[in-house]
Amino acid sequence: MAVQRAASPRRPPAPLWPRLLLPLLLLLLPAPSEGLGHSAELAFAVEPSDDVAVPGQPIVLDCRVEGTPPVRITWRKNGVELPESTHSTLLANGSLMIRHFRLEPGGSPSDEGDYECVAQNRFGLVVSRKARIQAATMSDFHVHPQATVGEEGGVARFQCQIHGLPKPLITWEKNRVPIDTDNERYTLLPKGVLQITGLRAEDGGIFHCVASNIASIRISHGARLTVSGSGSGAYKEPAILVGPENLTLTVHQTAVLECVATGNPRPIVSWSRLDGRPIGVEGIQVLGTGNLIISDVTVQHSGVYVCAANRPGTRVRRTAQGRLVVQAPAEFVQHPQSISRPAGTTAMFTCQAQGEPPPHVTWLKNGQVLGPGGHVRLKNNNSTLTISGIGPEDEAIYQCVAENSAGSSQASARLTVLWAEGLPGPPRNVRAVSVSSTEVRVSWSEPLANTKEIIGYVLHIRKAADPPELEYQEAVSKSTFQHLVSDLEPSTAYSFYIKAYTPRGASSASVPTLASTLGEAPAPPPLSVRVLGSSSLQLLWEPWPRLAQHEGGFKLFYRPASKTSFTGPILLPGTVSSYNLSQLDPTAVYEVKLLAYNQHGDGNATVRFVSLRGASERTALSPPCDCRKEEAANQTSTTGIVIGIHIGVTCIIFCVLFLLFGQRGRVLLCKDVENQLSPPQGPRSQRDPGILALNGARRGQRGQLGRDEKRVDMKELEQLFPPASAAGQPDPRPTQDPAAPAPCEETQLSVLPLQGCGLMEGKTTEAKTTEATAPCAGLAAAPPPPDGGPGLLSEGQASRPAAARVTQPAHSEQ
């Protein structure tokens, strides 16, 4: 739907000199320094890491800090500072020792949790990454090995599953004796799987799974392996008994993708990636008869792996697949850098981290989470921290913490605020008063002290509902204590505060003040009208959802142009963008009005006229186009198709010859019509007063007419849109020779312009000649209108209807 977007009334541009003065004020400030003794920055040399502790045993959490002494080190557990006690001891190097690790069920004190090392000196405070400390445990087996029967020469598989911290080491016993791991027919997988290939009678026995870690040792139930007689002579289709599982690992771990295949003859097992990329050879090995082992996995190893079992010498194959996801803990691509800035200026820190999944970035100020608000802004997924109008309270150590499901990392930087002596205080008595719907006047008093060196003021402006990063500034002369802020939005609350600037720096900010602009009625909405049928119209416009916020919407009126009163108002919400009118008089010309309203009243209306005679789908007052060319093209195309289907090739040739002999007469006639339309040489004539009568009063006279009482000159409408009843009346115009070629048809027009304009006015001689020949020649062949209206124009009648052919008149306001 090609409807133009509603444009708010144009505001006068804001004065240029405040924008030019602001950079001049900033140039007079002292140049910033990029660092003050970075060698003395407070930072961690060693941070605590995740660990598993044995209940009742001691554990040490490492932490070493570098920085300007004295440095105070404390520890937090789950975000709460640990008090000094005999249960835990702070070592001289900053590490924490827990003497007897506790794991008490049922809500009793436990030492499990997330630990952080906190270091502080006179410049600020930093917090280490979180280290998760868990107790070593061992559960019972939740999957025991099952009894298995295998054929001699075949494959047997046992599996057990158990949870524990740290991850248990799985070994196997046969008849209570550890199996021989040097036997190449026995394959032990780390996830608790035992595979035996090439089964023999001596492989039979009872197998146990043994799990062990620092917490405990567990032995599973026994499972018997029975080896039956050889069935090697029988053919068996290849089959995959066990395929690869979906795995999620962290970088540098080992991936084990299992694939156990059977068949006779023994199938060949191969591996590939579903995406077609090569698996590679570095760190890759095949364990047993088909298990894929990837050592030291990286993010690039992520993907879907396909195990295929092929019968030798044939294309018979079976496949199974599993997905490997490799995660990478967060690490920094760009660390924040320590900076120093003059008071009143802007400080910016940048911190970029990468990982898989992408890490989330959080900022800390002296160990406390820092969120956006006030003069603090976070952009680019929190990777950029901006602090505007810095003051002494902003001097601190800022940390960037990047964290994902695979791990976390932190980096810190220090902000030093250069505060010169003799800076002025904040401006006083700041007031903001609404002047109009787009202007607010802000006034203030100069600071109490140190005013002699003031070189200007900077006014900070933003919508009260907007985030701080959308704030903008305007500079004001030092001798001015008020400023008119223009180009604002109606019915909108704004926040204002001011700073005084000297060559040494800026003052602190004044107390913010709020003011709302006055409201106004909305602008006229753009309106398009489409003829859907002989008695229906479709009205199209752009929705304005904001009207609903101001108790507003749209009002729709319509009437036959011959009537005095309108039907309406039809009230529509601001979110609606179309409306259909039906059961209309197919012989009438309709006037349609659409206006927007809010709590401040009704806006100006957009008016459209449209005729339903000879109804076909048309667009009223559509964007500029050469309608005569379009109609001629459509008629030529349609005629060609109908003739080609119903008459045949012979009739096509006949019609072409007929058109060739008739074209010359039509061109000559249209040239005569165009000469009648062309204005005389010399000064341009005034617009036809009859056309102006159709459009109502001029701009200066609009206020004298009632909005709903204005009527259209019906004599003019009858000439432009003759009623259907006129078909039976004698035509007072000169008769047209039936043998003469038909000029442009009057009833082809369905659009009435709202402002006077001449068809040929302002056109070059070449353009006139072009429009007077080919387009008109095409229209001359148009059939008479079905409603019985006049179908032909004489040369003397072409002047006024031709002026009504313009399809893009200038918009008028009701």
Swiss-Prot record:
Belongs to the immunoglobulin superfamily. DCC family. It comes from Homo sapiens (Human). It is found in: Membrane. GO terms for cellular component: membrane. Disulfide bonds join 63-117, 160-209, 259-307, 351-400. Gene3D superfamilies: Immunoglobulins. Its main location: membrane. Residues 1-35 form the signal peptide. SUPFAM superfamilies: Fibronectin type III, Immunoglobulin. Residues 722-743, 762-814 are annotated as: Disordered. This is Immunoglobulin superfamily DCC subclass member 3. The chain crosses the membrane at residues 641-661. Keywords: Disulfide bond, Glycoprotein, Immunoglobulin domain, Membrane, Repeat, Signal, Transmembrane, Transmembrane helix. It is a single-pass membrane protein. InterPro entries: FN3_dom, FN3_sf, Ig-like_dom, Ig-like_dom_sf, Ig-like_fold, Ig_I-set, Ig_sub, Ig_sub2. Residues 36-139, 140-220, 238-321, 329-416 form the Ig-like C2-type domain. PROSITE patterns: FN3 (PS50853), IG_LIKE (PS50835). Residues 770-781 have a biased composition (Low complexity). The keyword Disulfide bond applies. One of its GO terms (biological process) is neuromuscular process controlling balance.
